[in-house]
């Protein structure tokens, strides 16, 4: 193709990358970033992309260096998504390896030593809202299948329970690490 006119929302595939064409109203986009000291063109582009992806039900991955504003972008995705529930944010690097399942999916009383009562997990807390998983690359490989199932099937099973619960939590994840490199090294699931 030598030339083609694009309309807003048009999707282009170039090699292994998908690009979405967006038109930006600069004054409106600048207002969205009023709390930030410097509204860069990159942030304005991010806001335009957020306008495109926020209404969908698809999971979102935000990659960038520490301090780049990934949580702010996740908050904007949630705000513009139209979802009624809460935005529940958690940093995956803070999870204890032994309690990740309980943190994400909850547990029933007696499920393990110290589980004296039922506990709602993060997925249930984000029901009808957004679950923001910061530093998703730090989630251990053995816990990734359960996360994938929760995202695909919209069902969770609290630790120690024999019953699944329906949840409608959209996942927005972020990482300063390149997940493609972790996938190649066998440390992160490609399907996640």
Regions found by a protein language model. Give the residues of each.
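AAA+ ATPase active-site-proximal loops
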Residues: 29-166, 171-177, 182-183
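Charged helix-capping and loop-helix junction motifs
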Residues: 185-188
């Amino acid at each position: 193709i030598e030339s083609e006119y694009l309309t807003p929302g048009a999707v282009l595939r170039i090699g292994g990358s998908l690009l979405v064409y967006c038109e930006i109203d600069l004054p409106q986009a600048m207002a969205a970033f009023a709390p930030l000291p410097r509204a860069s063109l990159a942030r304005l582009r991010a806001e335009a992309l957020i306008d495109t992806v926020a209404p969908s039900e698809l999971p979102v991955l935000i990659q960038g260096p520490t301090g780049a504003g990934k949580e702010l972008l996740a908050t904007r995705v949630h705000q513009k998504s139209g979802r009624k529930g809460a935005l529940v944010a958690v940093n995956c690097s803070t999870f204890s390896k032994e309690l990740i399942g309980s943190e994400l999916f909850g547990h029933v009383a007696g499920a393990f030593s110290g589980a004296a009562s039922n506990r709602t997990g993060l997925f249930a807390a984000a029901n009808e809202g957004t679950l923001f998983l910061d530093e998703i690359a730090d989630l251990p490989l053995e816990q990734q299948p359960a996360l994938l199932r929760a995202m695909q099937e919209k069902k969770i099973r609290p630790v120690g329970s024999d019953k699944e619960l329906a949840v409608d939590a959209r996942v927005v994840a972020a990482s300063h690490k390149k997940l493609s490199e972790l996938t190649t090294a066998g440390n992160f699931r490609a399907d996640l």
